[in-house]
Amino acid sequence: MKLSLLALVLGFILDLIIGDPHGLYHPIRLVGNLIGLLEKHMNKKSDSPDRQMVMGWLMALIVITLSSGIPLLLLLLAYHIHPVCGLVLETIMCWQLLATKSLKDESMKVYRKLKKHDLQGSRHAVSMIVGRDTEVLDETGVTKATVETVAENTSDGVIAPMLYMAIGGAFLGWMYKSINTMDSMVAYKNDRYLYFGRIPAYLDDIANYIPARLAGLLMVLASFLVRLDGTHAFAIFKRDRYNHASPNSAQTEAVMAGALNVQLAGDAWYFGELHKKKTIGDDIRPVEAEDIVRANKLLYGTAVVSLVIFTLVKYLILMF
């Protein structure tokens, strides 16, 4: 277990330095391909709602079993060959399961387009990291969408997998990512996924329940450390962290809104339909492109604080 903890630290460092290199096939794509293949054959529109839910549950079972079982077998084999082999493989897995640098890189692409006043380019850049319709967004809308996705993915893409890996190594990290990837692909409330995606959505809500709240609190702490408005961040966290259809998504969005002294969320277009949504935060000042830079500063601060706390707690547990 100490080697798994070391692998997490090394994997985090690799993520900060390398991120997701272009041209390198990401293992999460294999999980996505598996989900797409199973959904294509198992999600039949002609099926009854009950059968669609059963098939969604079966798909989730298959995806979770394969996505975590295969890495576990590979790790057991590698550690059996030699502890160093196991450490190297688990470090690579931990690196691939974290998304700190890639989240910053993708959001900064939007920032650079906004600074050039390239609205069409910024819409395209933000469409790569959000699920909403981006062609209707103005510059403020693009900026808000980017800040929101940095906030939400601070939990989903960094803190949650980090927490699960601190608890159970890369094996548990893969289990979490398989659930989270299913949620991002099939947990939509439309005709195609309303019933089929319900179980994956529930599983994601459960898997993120504790990590999202912990991420929110850690983000409040980090907001003080990176010299943002930590006091207001905590106030908005307490007030607005349930202003979302998801029980988890607004936890870190509320902290981000408070730390930046801006208002996030609100109505958004998805698949050509306007969805009425509550706002998060106070409209103290207008959202601006520089908020993307500030959001990334808070992302990195939260990631470092979380790693230090998680590894320290796990190390003390292993010692005693």
Language model regions located:
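Glycine-rich phosphate/dinucleotide-binding loop and adjoining beta-alpha-beta core of small-molecule
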Residues: 184
